[in-house]
Amino acid sequence: MAKKESFFKGVKSEMEKTSWPTKEELFKYTVIVVSTVIFFLVFFYALDLGITALKNLLFR
């Protein structure tokens, strides 16, 4: 039981040392991540359409 208590005390100690982002930073980083995901989604969708069209053109 002492090991468990020691573990959770260590976890609490490390969590207090953590630098958490502000609401503004969190929002900013979330927008960046979502924008990047959408960009790559559109990019790879367009690439897939292009490769499919090229394949259909070559192998009619």
Swiss-Prot record:
It holds the Pfam family SecE. The keyword Transport applies. GO terms for cellular component: plasma membrane. This is Protein translocase subunit SecE. Component of the Sec protein translocase complex. Heterotrimer consisting of SecY, SecE and SecG subunits. The heterotrimers can form oligomers, although 1 heterotrimer is thought to be able to translocate proteins. Interacts with the ribosome. Interacts with SecDF, and other proteins may be involved. Interacts with SecA. InterPro entries: SecE_bac, SecE_sf, Translocase_SecE/Sec61-g. HAMAP family: SecE. Gene3D superfamilies: Preprotein translocase secy subunit (1.20.5.1030). It is found in: Cell membrane. Belongs to the SecE/SEC61-gamma family. The lineage of its organism: Bacteria, Bacillati, Bacillota, Bacilli, Bacillales. Essential subunit of the Sec protein translocation channel SecYEG. Clamps together the 2 halves of SecY. May contact the channel plug during translocation. The gene is secE. GO terms for molecular function: protein transmembrane transporter activity. GO terms for biological process: intracellular protein transmembrane transport; protein secretion; protein targeting; protein transport by the Sec complex. It is a single-pass membrane protein. Coiled coil: none annotated. The chain crosses the membrane at residues 31-51. Keywords: Cell membrane, Membrane, Protein transport, Translocation, Transmembrane, Transmembrane helix, Transport. Its main location: membrane.
